């Protein structure tokens, strides 16, 4: 019985992918079961910001996640890939603010808080839909019914619960401390949102007169203070020197007169001071510098805030004690002509006034890093503001121990050190933001200034017996976005309710993320989860067992992808293709700087002169997996993408060869499996072992390479060719053996490749399954291949390996001697073992067919051969008689190269064996092996020289 079908010449990804995905989703294949007895496997996706669309970094990480999810689903695990999006407070609010400004000329204040928030929800509906559609295009096997958003009602309840409980435990408090303040956006921002930019600045050296007649060691009546920020001088509350700096030791505890403000401030000793920086004397401004803030706390210095929220100079200084409360016992006046000045105008005036007073010592050029808000785009100010904080040290201790004890493992392991360095120096976390979009802080105030924290206003009134007519005002601030995303693994599973999903899927198995958010997100998830989620024995649960840290995807030149560089690649464009015109519009449209737009356009035209061709999702995913070497940044490579699109076509064509082969015989009857059949089954099982081992180590690159190497080099290039002589001249039993092996290995190969290449494997598998006698609906629920030890056949691998070498030797002789591939040749071998002689006899027909040979003859060791071109395969001489078509010059040139190569190997081993250190340290077996190799090479050299002499004498 034969069966075959029609298959298109090429795989058309655009005709297949979206229809297949729709079918998978409609059939519910992505959903976990409710069977609690099955082992579970869960990944919580790092939720993309709802602000825009997916970039290549998302595509990269999500491909790796989906590979693991699909693999585990095929392993029979109850699999959940929990997805969703993040409300991304500041980023989303800014996108919508810009949108209404551009389209309507309005600000959020024109709308008011409630109406503006409704505008953001409208934007979220649009943008979130875009992201989920893109994730579908990537083939992500997600249960979309469980999709969450960090502002969903359930997740909002979890946020309130965590806030209230931490407050009740005394771990959340409100206080006045120094924060990164964005004077344009009027909000505190996290360190992650601060971009330090290299800048050419100045180091001003000011003279601060010593008070009460004090003098320096060299007789001066002033100290020279070096600063990069003259505008904060009015907030100075001390100057500091290093305690071991002999120049100033006699002055410690004395005072200087602060110029312009005319108040005395102390000279303090602190190890923070760098004796080599400037003059070794620095001004201490605790209200306007993070390092000074810490120095101020150590020395009990007042904090004098001289700036408004706009970063202008205040009319009156705000004076705060180290306890964060107003300090009435300290006086610091701001001169009238500074009041209201913009900070950089104040800088100029301070410098001019110091110069006018004769107190400007010198100005030196100075390279420095200026912190900018990455959203507002202006320099941030360290600012004393009232904010809410989490006291994280107790949480951090537990979270640190979890990694130390191996409950959570980082891959690559070196990232554990980064985690530890942050966690062991952790500071209280500022969690409030002065925004409208986000989780509003669940705290209420009455007119007397009392603060009430609860899950709702109703709970506040009940808990504190407050009368209905007592006016309460909810805190205007919202929580840092990282607060809600820190609850992601458990809030998405229904916490604080003890749901069956929480019991079944928590802790999750692996988190795949970038190194840049290990502290901001990963650490906080570990801290929050272990504090709030306990197992049945009351032991803190980790959020995930493994953190796999990926590198960044960079462009082909190794540059970070960014809109301003104009080098961003959209993963959907890799899949569908894009014209040059559309790509130019995408990269330069709406750009504020025309010169930059022209530069980007020029670079784009050069790199993508014909736009980007369609490659399909499978080629994109395979490229991303193949590039995923552990922890390293990845330079995107369009040539690799093209290569893997060709690989998809190679797999398609191999399947087409099998399934449209009219000689394919899957009928019942006697079956005889050939050496080649046994070899390909054995090689397949080794590939399965390599893939499984690679995936267990998160070496997606090695897993992809194992599939590629087997498919292209073993199955397509060799096994398919090895079956052709069988179908041409084999017995019926041999044809059945080859037919069954072809179909069986192809079907298993599709299952092996499915986690990385879901679409093409499903499309082909639907055609293969009937041939393979499989009655099932989808490849994704088929078992993933396991290593079958009984199918491992070292003898078959050795024999076919040797036959391949003989065939390659003949092909190389043809190429080097310019002999047509179709020309029949005589084939002589000399110096073969009895076992090799047997292999040749059993595979005579195969060798003749594959190497296009007219005859195969074994010569005895002392038997002379006619004039031939020779190749060595190990010790065996492969000889092709050259009568009638030898090119004497070409053959002598080829032999010269072979002789030089052999001499090089002999010299290498001679040097090794002549190295006394090597001979002294190397085991006897290693030395014996080297001597054996030397003898082999010397014998080979002798044969090549004999051959050379014979041809030269023609």
Curated annotation (Swiss-Prot):
This is Valine--tRNA ligase. Its main location: cytoplasm. One of its GO terms (cellular component) is cytosol. Keywords: Aminoacyl-tRNA synthetase, ATP-binding, Coiled coil, Cytoplasm, Ligase, Nucleotide-binding, Protein biosynthesis. It comes from Actinobacillus pleuropneumoniae serotype 7 (strain AP76). Belongs to the class-I aminoacyl-tRNA synthetase family. ValS type 1 subfamily. It is found in: Cytoplasm. One of its GO terms (biological process) is valyl-tRNA aminoacylation. Pfam families: Anticodon_1, tRNA-synt_1, Val_tRNA-synt_C. HAMAP family: Val_tRNA_synth_type1.
């Amino acid at each position: 019985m034969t069966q075959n079908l029609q298959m298109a010449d090429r795989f058309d990804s655009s005709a297949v992918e979206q229809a297949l995905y729709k079918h998978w989703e409609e059939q519910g294949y992505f959903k976990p079961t409710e069977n609690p007895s099955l082992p579970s496997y869960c990944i919580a996706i790092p939720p993309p910001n709802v602000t825009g669309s997916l970039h290549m970094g998302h595509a990269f990480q999500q491909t790796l996640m989906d590979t693991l999810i699909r693999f585990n689903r095929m392993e029979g695990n109850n699999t959940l890939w929990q997805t969703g999006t993040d409300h991304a407070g500041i980023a989303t609010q800014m996108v919508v603010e810009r949108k209404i400004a551009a389209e309507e000329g309005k600000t959020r204040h024109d709308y008011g808080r409630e109406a503006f928030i409704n505008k953001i929800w409208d934007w979220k509906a649009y943008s979130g839909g875009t992201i989920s559609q893109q994730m579908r295009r990537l083939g992500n096997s997600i249960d979309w019914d469980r999709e969450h958003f960090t502002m969903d009602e359930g997740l909002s309840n979890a946020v309130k619960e965590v806030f209230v409980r931490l407050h009740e435990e005394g771990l959340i408090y409100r206080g006045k401390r120094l924060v990164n303040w964005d004077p344009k956006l009027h909000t505190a921002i996290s360190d992650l949102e601060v971009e330090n930019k290299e800048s050419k600045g100045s180091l001003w050296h000011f003279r601060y007169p010593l008070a009460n007649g004090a003098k320096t060691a060299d007789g001066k009546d002033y100290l020279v203070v070096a600063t990069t920020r003259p505008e904060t001088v009015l907030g100075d509350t001390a100057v500091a020197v290093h305690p071991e700096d002999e120049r100033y030791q006699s002055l410690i505890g004395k005072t200087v007169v602060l110029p312009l403000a005319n108040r005395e401030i102390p000279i303090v000793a602190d190890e923070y001071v760098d004796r080599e920086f400037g003059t070794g004397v620095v001004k201490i401004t605790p209200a306007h510098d993070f390092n000074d803030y810490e120095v101020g706390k150590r020395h009990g210095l007042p904090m004098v805030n001289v700036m408004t929220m706009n970063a202008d100079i205040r009319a009156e200084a705000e004076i705060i004690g180290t306890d964060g409360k107003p300090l009435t016992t300290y006086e610091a006046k701001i001169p009238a002509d500074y009041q209201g000045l913009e900070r950089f105008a104040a800088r100029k005036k301070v410098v001019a006034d110091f110069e006018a007073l004769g107190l400007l010592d010198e100005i030196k050029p100075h390279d420095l890093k200026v912190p900018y808000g990455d959203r507002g785009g202006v320099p941030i100010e360290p600012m004393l503001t009232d904010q809410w904080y989490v006291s994280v040290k107790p949480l951090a201790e537990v979270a640190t121990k979890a990694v130390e004890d191996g409950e959570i493992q980082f891959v690559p392991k070196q990232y554990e050190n980064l985690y530890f360095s942050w966690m062991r120096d952790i500071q209280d976390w500022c969690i409030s933001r002065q925004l409208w979009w986000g989780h509003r802080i669940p705290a209420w105030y009455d007119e007397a200034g009392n603060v009430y924290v609860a899950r709702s206003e109703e709970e506040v009134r009940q808990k504190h017996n407050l009368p209905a007519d007592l006016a309460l005002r909810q805190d205007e601030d919202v929580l840092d976005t990282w607060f809600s995303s820190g609850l992601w693994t458990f809030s998405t599973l229904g916490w604080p309710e003890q749901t069956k999903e929480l019991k079944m899927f928590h802790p999750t198995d692996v988190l795949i993320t970038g190194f840049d958010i290990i502290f901001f997100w990963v650490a906080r998830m570990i801290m929050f989860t272990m504090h709030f989620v306990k197992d049945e024995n009351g032991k803190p649960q980790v959020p995930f067992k493994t953190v796999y840290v990926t590198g960044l995807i960079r462009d082909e030149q190794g540059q970070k992808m960014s809109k301003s560089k104009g080098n961003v690649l959209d993963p959907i464009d890799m899949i569908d293709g894009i014209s040059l015109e559309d790509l130019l519009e995408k990269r330069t449209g709406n750009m504020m700087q025309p010169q930059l737009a022209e530069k980007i356009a020029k670079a784009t035209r050069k790199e993508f002169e014909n736009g980007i061709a369609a490659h399909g999702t499978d080629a994109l995913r395979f490229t991303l997996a193949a590039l995923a070497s552990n922890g390293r940044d990845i330079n995107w490579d369009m040539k690799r993408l093209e290569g893997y699109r060709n690989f998809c076509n190679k797999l398609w064509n191999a399947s087409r060869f099998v399934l449209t082969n009219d000689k394919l015989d899957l009928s019942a009857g006697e079956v005889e499996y050939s050496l080649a059949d046994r070899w390909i089954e054995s090689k397949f099982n080794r590939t399965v072992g390599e893939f499984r081992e690679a995936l267990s180590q998160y070496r997606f690159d090695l897993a992809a390479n194992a599939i590629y190497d087997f498919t292209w080099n073993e199955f397509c290039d060799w096994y398919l060719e090895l079956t052709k002589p069988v179908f041409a001249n084999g017995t019926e039993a041999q044809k059945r053996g080859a037919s069954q092996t072809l179909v069986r290995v192809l079907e298993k190969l599709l299952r092996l490749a499915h986690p990385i290449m879901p679409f093409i494997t499903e499309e082909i598998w639907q055609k293969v399954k009937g041939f393979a006698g499989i009655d099932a609906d989808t490849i994704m629920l088929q078992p993933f291949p396991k290593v079958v030890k009984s199918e491992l056949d070292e003898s078959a691998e050795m024999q076919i390996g040797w036959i391949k070498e003989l065939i390659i030797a003949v092909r190389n002789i043809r190429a080097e001697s310019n002999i047509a591939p179709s020309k029949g040749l005589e084939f002589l071998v000399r110096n073969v073992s009895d076992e090799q002689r047997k292999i040749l006899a059993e595979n005579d027909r195969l060798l003749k067919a594959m190497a296009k040979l007219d005859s195969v003859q074994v010569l005895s060791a002392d038997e002379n051969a006619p004039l031939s071109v020779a190749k060595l395969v190990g010790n065996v001489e492969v000889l092709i008689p050259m009568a009638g078509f030898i090119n004497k010059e070409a053959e002598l040139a080829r032999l010269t190269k072979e002789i030089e190569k052999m001499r090089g190997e002999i010299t290498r081993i001679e040097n090794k064996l002549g190295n006394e250190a090597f001979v002294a340290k190397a085991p006897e077996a290693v030395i014996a092996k080297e001597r054996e190799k030397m003898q082999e090479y010397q014998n080979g050299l002798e044969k090549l020289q004999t051959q050379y002499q014979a041809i030269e004498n023609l």
